[in-house]
From Swiss-Prot:
Belongs to the melanin-concentrating hormone family. One of its GO terms (cellular component) is synapse. GO terms for biological process: chemical synaptic transmission; neuropeptide signaling pathway. Disulfide bonds join C124-C133. Keywords: Cleavage on pair of basic residues, Disulfide bond, Hormone, Neuropeptide, Signal. The gene is mch. This is Pro-MCH.
Amino acid sequence: MRQSRLSIIFAAALFFKCYALTVALPMAKAEDGSLEKDAFTSLLNDEATENSLGDAELSSMTKSRAPRVIVIAADANLWRDLRVLHNGLPLYKRRVDENNQVVEHKDVGQDLTIPILRRDTMRCMVGRVYRPCWEV
């Protein structure tokens, strides 16, 4: 489901990038039917000039264009939240576990070789209800 959303977003971004030039053209050009051809040829001409430019011409070309912005998520919490959502755990549970200090119970029947975070996510059947194993 997530991959289909991502592919739809990329398709929409590519679609709007291709037709962004046609939006700025006046309606008089749209009536003669050459609107799509003009946009397509201008895109091809831009790509051809970018591929054939030298270093000096490229630096002058980039100055006249609007700068491209690349956004990189530098916050580690954002990536962790995305990983948690991808793994299927609810985000609010992850944040609650971080904010609250978990009291560690030392029961005799509890397996101490399993790390505490893993024990909190494991579920044990208690009666008819699944509960975290450390509550058992």
